[in-house]
Amino acid sequence: MRPRKRRIVDFEHSARQFRPFGPESEIPEEVLLTIDELEVMRLSFLENLSQGEAALRMEIHQSTFQRALKKALEKVTDALVHGKAIRIEGGDYRMPRGDGTGPAGQGPVGGGRSRGQGKGRGGRFGGPDGNCVCPACGYETPHTPGVSCSQVKCEKCGSSMVRK
């Protein structure tokens, strides 16, 4: 069996979980949707790309894209029909550039670190730890999970930060 090819994800998704309305105790289960599965749905339904075009963007074969889309839709449908929460994390993907900017202007630093469940395979989305650093003046601030460092402005000089 050959190794699984990591998929290109152009967009850092800020939502990490969706839950049915109601008390937490009433939600029996959750479904895990990976980052690359969410990207497959985004490219297909929000960017209206054909499966061939979307597969090229993710640098995978069209048949792989089709299987990932089917799997993602099955998971979301299961969650909606059975009232399950959807947790979004992990997957086998990489961001296209290692400076925190990706083609969509977002993304974690360290494109290769995003394999599996993030930094060290135990974290989420490239790891919740770490710092955002200003490339212009060197100022550092702790990374806030769920917020791309490229969206944070340096307190000293106003430049966009990058993930360290």
UniProtKB/Swiss-Prot annotation:
Residues 91-124 are annotated as: Disordered. InterPro entries: RNA_pol_sigma_r3/r4-like, UPF0251. SUPFAM superfamilies: Sigma3 and sigma4 domains of RNA polymerase sigma factors. Pfam families: DUF134. Residues 99-115 have a biased composition (Gly residues). Belongs to the UPF0251 family. This is UPF0251 protein MA_0157. The lineage of its organism: Archaea, Methanobacteriati, Methanobacteriota, Stenosarchaea group, Methanomicrobia.
